[in-house]
Amino acid sequence: MTDITIYHNPACGTSRNTLALIRNSGIEPAIILYLETPPNREQLKALISAMGIDARALLRKNVEPYEKLGLAEERFSDEQLIEAMLNYPILINRPIVVSPLGTRLCRPSEAVLDILPDAQQGEFRKEDGEKVIDKHGNRIV
């Protein structure tokens, strides 16, 4: 049983890199494919609260529903933005990782390192070749 959960989109490079960093620490997380199984209202509100952000900070802006619904306008309340994310899960930014050390929107993917309970177990390179963990498991800054 795992204490780490990732809200994951396998089509997203940042999400894939985040999952790989979790696995590089020796943890197999619970994986929620959030586009197939989106969070319900209570879960989404709890995630937003746990991250200490407002709904707008979780909103993806480079997807069609964002423009179509005019979500760039500041007139929308958090409740209205949450409703939009529930109706169009593609609007939920990702990956979101929940761990005993916190909940984060892991953009960039290295943000997950701050909430992993276990150290990295060796070198890690992102899909684009960028080295973020050295062969000793230490973060490269």
Protein language model features and the residues they cover:
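Non-globular targeting/processing and membrane-anchoring segments
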Residues: T2, L86-N93, V98-V141
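Structural alpha/beta surface segment adjacent to cysteine/selenocysteine redox centers
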Residues: T5-P10, T14-R75
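Low-complexity, compositionally biased segments
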Residues: C12, P65, L81, K131, ...
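Glycine-rich loops and low-complexity Gly/Arg-rich segments
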Residues: A30-I32, I53-L58, I82-A84, Q121-F124, ...
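Thioredoxin-like thiol-disulfide oxidoreductase module
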Residues: Y66, E74-P89
